[in-house]
């Protein structure tokens, strides 16, 4: 399995949206659906995992979380989106409106963390530490819980190339790497999936990426 540096991950996204004409909207939709599929696979409703908290950051990773929340609601989960630092980006605001129209709570404060699973969609591969402000307090509280955590692309607060940092998410049970895994999760010991199947075959071959999907799979376990 090949692991991407931060620079490689950024250039990959640029090429997807440049030469291959993907929009950010498309990438978020495909990524968010993949995350939702991982949640249903690892924490199915029939095993008592109905209440899911989606913790969203202000950037694109948070957008993936918003999309994930919409799909999980369609799949029958009781979803709450915790979005303490909302972006004014037009597309992200549209994603919020979609949730609100479908009566999916989007909140900026939480009085309880009593959920069956938490989706960590705060910081992605563009993050450069350290963790500051409200998210430092949120991560500290989440790290004290025993609720399963599913991280999107990389556990929030980790260095994209060096891995775990003290003020980030300390315990990630399930990780879904988008496009290709990042260098900072090379030694990740939890359940690891690959998702976000939007890399054209030509680009895959050019970058020598190993993407072990079979036929019509949108997610695949890689450990």
Swiss-Prot record:
A Gene Ontology molecular function term of the record: nucleotide binding
Domain called YjeF N-terminal: residue spans: 9-211
Catalyzed reactions: (6R)-NADHX = (6S)-NADHX; (6R)-NADPHX = (6S)-NADPHX
Cofactors demanded by this protein: K(+)
Domain of life: Eukaryota
Signal peptide positions (record): none
Top EC class for this record: isomerase
Pfam families per the UniProt record, alphabetical: YjeF_N
SUPFAM superfamilies reported for this sequence: YjeF N-terminal domain-like (SSF64153)
Sites where the protein binds K(+): 61, 120, 156
EC number(s) on file: 5.1.99.6
One GO cellular component term: mitochondrion
Co-factor: note: Binds 1 potassium ion per subunit.
Coiled-coil region(s): none
Amino acids binding (6S)-NADPHX: 60-64, 124-130, 153
Keywords: Isomerase, Metal-binding, NAD, NADP, Nucleotide-binding, Potassium
InterPro entries the UniProt entry points to: YjeF_N_dom, YjeF_N_dom_sf, YJEFN_prot_NAXE-like
Gene3D superfamilies listed in its UniProt record: YjeF N-terminal domain (3.40.50.10260)
Family: Belongs to the NnrE/AIBP family.
Family annotation (HAMAP family): NADHX_epimerase
Functional description taken from the UniProt entry: Catalyzes the epimerization of the S- and R-forms of NAD(P)HX, a damaged form of NAD(P)H that is a result of enzymatic or heat-dependent hydration. This is a prerequisite for the S-specific NAD(P)H-hydrate dehydratase to allow the repair of both epimers of NAD(P)HX.
PANTHER family: NAD(P)H-HYDRATE EPIMERASE
Protein name listed in UniProt: NAD(P)H-hydrate epimerase
Source organism per UniProt: Entamoeba histolytica (strain ATCC 30459 / HM-1:IMSS / ABRM)
């Amino acid at each position: 399995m090949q692991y991407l540096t931060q620079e490689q991950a950024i250039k990959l996204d640029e090429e997807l949206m440049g030469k291959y004409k993907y929009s950010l909207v498309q990438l978020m939709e495909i990524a968010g659906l993949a995350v939702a599929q991982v949640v249903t696979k690892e924490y199915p409703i029939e095993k008592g995992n109905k209440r899911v908290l989606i913790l969203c950051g202000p950037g694109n990773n948070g957008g993936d979380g918003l999309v994930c929340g919409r799909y999980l609601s369609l799949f029958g989960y009781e979803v709450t989106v915790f979005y303490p630092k909302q972006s004014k980006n037009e597309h992200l605001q549209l994603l919020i409106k979609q949730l609100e129209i479908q009566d999916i709570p989007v909140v900026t404060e939480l009085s309880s963390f009593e959920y069956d699973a938490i989706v960590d969609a705060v910081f992605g591969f563009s993050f450069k530490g350290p963790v500051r402000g409200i998210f430092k307090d949120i991560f500290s509280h989440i790290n004290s819980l025993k609720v399963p955590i599913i991280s999107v692309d990389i556990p929030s607060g980790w260095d994209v190339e060096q891995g775990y940092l003290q003020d980030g998410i300390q315990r990630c049970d399930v990780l879904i790497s988008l496009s290709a895994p990042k260098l900072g999760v090379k030694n990740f010991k939890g359940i690891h999936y690959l998702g976000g199947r939007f890399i054209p075959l030509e680009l895959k071959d050019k970058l020598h990426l190993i993407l072990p999907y079979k036929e019509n799979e949108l997610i695949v376990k890689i450990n």
